[in-house]
Amino acid sequence: MNDLIEDFLHFLIVERGLSANTIKAYERDLRYFVSYMDVAKGLTDPNTLERSDIVGFMAFARQEGKSARSVARYIASLRSFFHYLMHDGKMSHDPMIQIETPKQAQGLPKVLNLDDVEKLLSSSDTSTPLGLRDQAMMEILYATGLRVTELVSLKMDDLHLHMGFIQTIGKGDKERIIPLGKTATTVLEKYLEEARPKLRRPKYRNDFVFLNHHGQGLTRQGFWKILKGIAKESGIEKPITPHTLRHSFATHLLENGADLRSVQELLGHADISTTQIYTHVTKLRLKDVYKQFHPRA
């Protein structure tokens, strides 16, 4: 089975051109399934799999505390894997027939209000190179709605500050161009002029915009650690994740009159239904405002 997984991952890289993060997610899901089947059935040949094995795996995952969202992702990964094996003639039947994807509760994105955004953006110690970097990253995230992977992947050639925009490669290798406001541009220029040269190291000749203290490009995990520190310093009691500023970016645009299609393009969503979730957030926030300020609410 492990050899078949390697073949599948190679197919995803070469034929479908999926991102490294997506490939890792597929691999993680499939390895989890194989580890379960090794214990449950001593699996070596996928042709021995039956529908009951998939049902048993789903039950096992839920017993381990996996969410409905995680189980749904496992099922999607297995469907793709088995479809590949059948198409390649390495599997004679589909054990996923009549397997239903678990229904997921549609959670609304967590959004910061403007006061909390201001606290978060002003909580970095800008007297140090790393603090200037952190402030610039926070400003860029809120100003552009970038995903964290897109942020840490930014290269110097992606910046067009004199023209007021940056470019990025998002999901599905789709390029998009995003305007950059004056505040974010000013903060970013300060970081590039005063802090980044101090973080660069001769042995690491890379052109990533945001560098760690070793002079290397930041990782998503590295950014997550930085964000936790900034969130703690800000005193904001709400949970803050790497996606919080992206959610806030989208919601605040819609609240101030931006049309849904423009927000979809800025976020890089392939399907507008993904963007529509933010309209539900704005409606709930309007309801809260009404209850708070209308005399007969």
Curated annotation (Swiss-Prot):
Q: Which domain of life is it from?
A: Bacteria
List UniProt keywords, sorted A-Z.
Cell cycle, Cell division, Chromosome partition, Cytoplasm, DNA integration, DNA recombination, DNA-binding
> A GO molecular function for this record?
tyrosine-based site-specific recombinase activity
- Entry GO CC: cytoplasm
GO biological process, alphabetically ordered: cell division; chromosome segregation; DNA transposition
Q: Which residues form the active site?
A: 147, 171, 243, 246, 269, 278
Query: Which positions are tagged coiled coil?
Result: none
Q: Where in the cell is it found?
A: Cytoplasm
Q: Which residues form the Core-binding (CB) domain?
A: 1-86
Domain Tyr recombinase: residue ranges: 107-291
**InterPro entries from the UniProt entry:** CB (IPR044068), DNA_brk_join_enz (IPR011010), Integrase-like_cat_sf (IPR013762), Integrase_catalytic (IPR002104), Integrase_recombinase_N (IPR010998), Integrase_SAM-like_N (IPR004107), Recomb_XerD (IPR011932), Tyrosine_recombinase_XerC/XerD (IPR023009)
Subunit field text:
Forms a cyclic heterotetrameric complex composed of two molecules of XerC and two molecules of XerD.
Query: Matching HAMAP family, A to Z?
Result: Recomb_XerC_XerD, Recomb_XerD
> Belongs to which family?
Belongs to the 'phage' integrase family. XerD subfamily.
- Its biological function? Site-specific tyrosine recombinase, which acts by catalyzing the cutting and rejoining of the recombining DNA molecules. The XerC-XerD complex is essential to convert dimers of the bacterial chromosome into monomers to permit their segregation at cell division. It also contributes to the segregational stability of plasmids.
Name assigned to this protein: Tyrosine recombinase XerD
